[in-house]
């Protein structure tokens, strides 16, 4: 986007890159384009892994007023998955969705019986990836295929050096900028992670 906050996928050389693409999000009722979804088709041993890196439209103007933007992106991604992946593939969908796991775009549009949102599981590690007015929740999520794989760990990565405490005693991820002010942090979101084996 205009701030240079774009999506990328870094791939270890142990993986073979079979294909890559930028999934365009062209919403006809929006004057401003939103970020592409980065797609990578990888091969590890005999397993095909489809990776989708997302940063969906913000909640600027309010969750309800902006909801249709994220629902549209979810519909585009769902259609891409249905048309371009096979049942034997392992799909790995990650990013900042600017919606929570229970919101329409994720719970009703994207995540069907073939997928599971790991941030909805009771054994997720951490209290959330984002703190909004003192309330932690998951804007940043990892969604995977309902396949035969072994989960090792997943959740939000949080260390003391990444955080700050405000005057109310509330703990937040330390952002880089707040308006024109430089706070020397890395992000107002915590990174999410997943470790698994097939």
Residues of each region from the PLM?
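A short local loop/turn or secondary-structure capping micro-motif enriched for an aromatic residue
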Residues: 26-29, 58-61, 160-162
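Extracytoplasmic, non-cytosolic globular domains
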Residues: 38-123
């Amino acid at each position: 986007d205009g701030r240079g906050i774009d999506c990328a996928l870094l791939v270890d050389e142990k993986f073979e890159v079979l294909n890559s693409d930028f999934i365009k999000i062209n919403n006809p009722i929006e004057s401003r384009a939103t970020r592409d979804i980065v797609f990578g088709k990888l091969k590890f041993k005999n397993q095909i892994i489809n990776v989708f890196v997302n940063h969906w439209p913000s909640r600027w103007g309010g969750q309800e007023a902006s909801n249709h933007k994220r629902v549209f992106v979810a519909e585009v991604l769902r259609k891409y998955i249905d048309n371009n992946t096979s049942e034997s593939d392992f799909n790995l969908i990650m990013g900042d969705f600017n919606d929570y796991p229970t919101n329409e775009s994720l719970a009703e549009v994207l995540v069907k019986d073939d997928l599971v949102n790991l941030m909805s599981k009771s054994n997720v590690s951490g209290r959330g990836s984002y703190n909004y007015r003192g309330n932690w929740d998951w804007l940043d999520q990892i969604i995977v295929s309902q396949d035969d794989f072994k989960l090792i760990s997943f959740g939000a990565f949080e260390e003391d050096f990444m955080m700050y405490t405000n005057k109310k005693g509330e703990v937040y991820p330390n952002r880089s900028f707040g308006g024109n002010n430089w706070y020397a942090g890395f992000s107002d979101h915590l990174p999410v992670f997943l470790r698994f084996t097939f």
